[in-house]
C-alpha cells in the first residue's frame, strides 16, 4: 500500500484538489529541465511555465508549493551534492505507478528544457543525455513487476539523479554577482 504521507502523494493531492491535471513528477521534471537549460531561478518565470502545464493560474497554496519546490531544486543544483532528489512515488508504490511517474518526469524535463534551451549548442554528452531522457519517457510500460524490473527501475532512477547535472553544468547561467557599491 502506498505511503499516503509521502511528499509525492501530498503534492499530488494538493494539485488534484485544486483542479490541476498534472502529476508532481511531470511538474518536477519541468522545473529541473528548465533550470538545466539555463532559465535561472526567477520565481515569476517558473510560475509562468508551471501555469502552462497546470492549464490554469495556480492559487496561493499551489503557488507557494511551487516556489518551495523551486527553492529546493535551486539548492540541489547549486549545492555541493552530485545528485538531485527526484519527486517520484515512494518505493512501496506499485512498480507500474513508479515507472509511469518516471516517464512523466522525463516528459516534463524534456518540455522544460525545450522551452528554455533556445537552440543552444550542446556537447555530444549533453545530446546523449537528452536522447536517453526521450527513450526513458517512452519505455515505462516495459518494466515488469519482478526483481529484474525493480532493478531496472532503480538503475534508471539513479541515472536520472545525476544525468541532469551534466546539462546544468554545461548550460545554466551563473547567478549574477551582486553589484558592490563603489566609492567615488
UniProtKB/Swiss-Prot annotation:
InterPro entries: YgfB-like, YgfB-like_sf. It comes from the Bacteria. GO terms for cellular component: cytosol. Signal peptide: none annotated. Pfam families: UPF0149 (PF03695). Belongs to the UPF0149 family. This is UPF0149 protein PSEEN5316. The lineage of its organism: Bacteria, Pseudomonadati, Pseudomonadota, Gammaproteobacteria, Pseudomonadales.
